[in-house]
Curated annotation (Swiss-Prot):
HAMAP family: DNA_primase_sml_arc. One of its GO terms (molecular function) is metal ion binding. Catalytic subunit of DNA primase, an RNA polymerase that catalyzes the synthesis of short RNA molecules used as primers for DNA polymerase during DNA replication. The small subunit contains the primase catalytic core and has DNA synthesis activity on its own. Binding to the large subunit stabilizes and modulates the activity, increasing the rate of DNA synthesis while decreasing the length of the DNA fragments, and conferring RNA synthesis capability. The DNA polymerase activity may enable DNA primase to also catalyze primer extension after primer synthesis. May also play a role in DNA repair. SUPFAM superfamilies: Prim-pol domain (SSF56747). GO terms for cellular component: DNA-directed RNA polymerase complex; primosome complex. The active site is at residues 96, 98, 237. Heterodimer of a small subunit (PriS) and a large subunit (PriL). CDD domains: AE_Prim_S (cd04860). This is DNA primase small subunit PriS. It comes from the Archaea. NCBIfam families: PRK00419.1-3. Belongs to the eukaryotic-type primase small subunit family.
């Protein structure tokens, strides 16, 4: 869809207003991370090296990018153009949970999608990372992506050296892809003591269904596996996790398709976090704007404003205008 040039320039000015009013803290070890961004013209700039907070904020205020990223990886030479020459030294363990990937997402409202993916994020952190894998909560950070889901970052000496294969195994585990009839059958036949994780859950489900372990069939095991997976599996975007050179959205930056912040959420406050209120920059709460809505908007909420607009000219709060223009649903007038 072609975007209106004048409207895009207005949106860029509003993004600039945000970056000039906000001191963004760089990710830890910024000197070892590759930094990249996408301009409002669609150009992708990569292989940048920044030394400190001043350089980061100066870059944001002078270039005013639409999207900003930094690498999960740490490099000896992050500004080298060829990956082998960067000299990889390790990487955070990253999980990307996107509500677009949820079953039945096309029938959900935006708010319902975000609520559902939030529950999956809680499950990933509490059940899999902390309980099953023994990762300390102090090494886990949750970020609202700024649009449709959450990013979970794990930073610790235990995960830094993990290669792509080990990271892929972790995604297979949290999504339940590593679970099979043969794995459960073996655990039942060997009488594995104190099974944990998925095996424990499936065996518990078998007992719950009243199935005798001595007369169990593969079909019954498959049924239990399907029920447990449907309740416990977490849908992560696997390539984001196992790609050890991946760029991920930079915390506190604006998402170019929503105008909302990539916002960190404390683990102990995650239940109360409302992205449709808490991720809207305060500087976007001032004033109203005229916009041209392309087609009737699907019902959704931002703060306490119910967006249900007809096509054509509408006057809306600034943050609503930014959201609709950023997502391609409207243009500034």
């Amino acid at each position: 869809m072609m975007r209106d040039f004048v409207s895009e320039e207005k949106l860029k000015l509003l993004f600039e207003k945000y970056y000039r009013s906000t001191d963004i803290d760089p990710p830890a070890l910024i000197t070892k991370r590759e930094v990249g961004f996408m301009t409002f013209e669609g150009e992708i700039i990569r292989h940048m090296h920044l030394s400190n907070k001043f350089e980061l904020n100066n870059m944001l205020r002078t270039t005013v990018p639409r999207h900003v990223y930094s690498s999960a990886a740490y490099y000896k030479k992050p500004d080298e153009k060829k990956m082998p020459e960067k000299i990889w030294e390790g990487a955070d363990l990253i999980f990307d949970l996107d509500s677009d990937h949820l079953p039945g997402a096309e029938k959900m409202t935006y708010e319902e999608m975000l609520n559902s993916i939030k529950e999956q994020t809680k499950r990933l952190v509490n059940k899999f990372l902390v309980s099953d894998l023994g990762i300390s909560e102090k090494d886990i950070r949750i970020y609202f992506s700024g649009s449709r889901g959450y990013h979970v970052h794990v930073s610790s000496e235990d995960v830094y050296p993990l290669g792509s294969d080990a990271r892929r195994e972790i995604t297979d585990y949290v999504s339940g892809n590593s679970l099979s009839i043969s794995v459960i059958d073996k655990a039942l036949k060997t009488g594995e003591k104190r099974p944990g994780g998925w095996i424990k859950d499936v065996i518990s489900k078998l007992y719950e269904l009243g199935i005798n372990a001595e007369k169990i069939s593969q079909k019954q095991i498959e049924r239990a596996i399907d029920q447990v997976k449907s309740h416990n599996a977490t849908m992560v975007d696997a390539p984001v996790t196992y790609d050890i050179h991946r760029l991920i959205r930079m915390p506190q930056s604006l998402h170019g398709k929503s105008g909302m912040m990539v916002k960190e959420v404390d683990l102990d406050k995650f239940d109360d976090f409302d992205p449709l209120s808490d991720a809207i920059p305060k500087i976007f709460l001032e004033g109203d704007y005229d916009i041209n809505v392309h087609e009737k908007t699907r019902k959704l909420r931002l703060l306490d404003y119910k967006i249900d607009l007809p096509p054509g000219r509408n006057r809306v709060p600034q943050y609503v205008a930014i959201f609709l223009v950023s997502s391609g649903r409207a243009d500034f007038l």
